[in-house]
Amino acid sequence: MKVAVIKYNAGNIRSVDYALKRLGVEAVVTSDKEVLKAADKVIFPGVGEAETTMLHLKESGMDHFIKELRQPVLGICLGMQLMCRFSEEGNVDCLGIFDTDVKRFAPRKHEEKVPHMGWNTISCLKSDLFKGFTRDEFVYFVHSYYVPVSEFTAAETDYIRPFSAALHKDNFYATQFHPEKSGEAGERIIKNFLEL
């Protein structure tokens, strides 16, 4: 199986590559569109800022390319947010794969800190990504923006308000949390993605 990780102006590529190696998978980290198109699975990671990253994707033509991929694609954190229609982070149009917007957390109480950083459980698991997953397992989040619950929600969690922990539409899967930093539970999610 050929697995490719999209290389672009964003962080956490190394931790995704390391998580794949722990599963015995040698992935290619690349921005080469032909290599990405030929891969069996594509991972679209991201840590960074939506406006700057979308600008980079547009300049490289990667914005249209990602939307045209037909194999299973997994967006992680910022990767998930960029798959949405619009982000309040920089008020930028995104890829529009998921017809929903990314919003900034608005804390109602002093103890509700932004960013949402740390371990949380997820529920309403509606995707093969979560095969063998139980409600009491924790995954790791680091984000200041969220995607509201919608028809594309494949898993949800609650911090300040309920929101989408994962999205799914056709061949596109996405997690707001970092499976590559979520221990055994996260490894199982990556393994499930590779088995799709």
Curated annotation (Swiss-Prot):
Pathway field: Amino-acid biosynthesis; L-histidine biosynthesis; L-histidine from 5-phospho-alpha-D-ribose 1-diphosphate: step 5/9
Active site: 77, 178, 180
Catalytic reactions of this protein: 5-[(5-phospho-1-deoxy-D-ribulos-1-ylimino)methylamino]-1-(5-phospho-beta-D-ribosyl)imidazole-4-carboxamide + L-glutamine = D-erythro-1-(imidazol-4-yl)glycerol 3-phosphate + 5-amino-1-(5-phospho-beta-D-ribosyl)imidazole-4-carboxamide + L-glutamate + H(+); L-glutamine + H2O = L-glutamate + NH4(+)
Molecular function as annotated in GO: glutaminase activity; imidazoleglycerol-phosphate synthase activity; lyase activity
EC number(s) recorded for this UniProt protein: 4.3.2.10, 3.5.1.2
Gene3D superfamilies registered for this protein in UniProt: 3.40.50.880
Keyword tRNA-binding: no
Cellular component, GO, one term: cytoplasm
InterPro entries to which the protein is assigned, alphabetical: Class_I_gatase-like, GATASE, Imidazole-glycPsynth_HisH
Keywords associated with the record: Amino-acid biosynthesis, Cytoplasm, Glutamine amidotransferase, Histidine biosynthesis, Hydrolase, Lyase
Chief location bin: cytoplasm
UniProt subcellular location: Cytoplasm
Signal peptide extent: none
Keyword Iron: no
Gene Ontology BP annotations: L-histidine biosynthetic process
Domain Glutamine amidotransferase type-1 intervals: 2-196
Primary role: IGPS catalyzes the conversion of PRFAR and glutamine to IGP, AICAR and glutamate. The HisH subunit catalyzes the hydrolysis of glutamine to glutamate and ammonia as part of the synthesis of IGP and AICAR. The resulting ammonia molecule is channeled to the active site of HisF.
NCBIfam families: IMP_synth_hisH
Subunit comment: Heterodimer of HisH and HisF.
Entry-linked HAMAP family: HisH
Protein name: Imidazole glycerol phosphate synthase subunit HisH
Organism name: Bacteroides fragilis (strain ATCC 25285 / DSM 2151 / CCUG 4856 / JCM 11019 / LMG 10263 / NCTC 9343 / Onslow / VPI 2553 / EN-2)
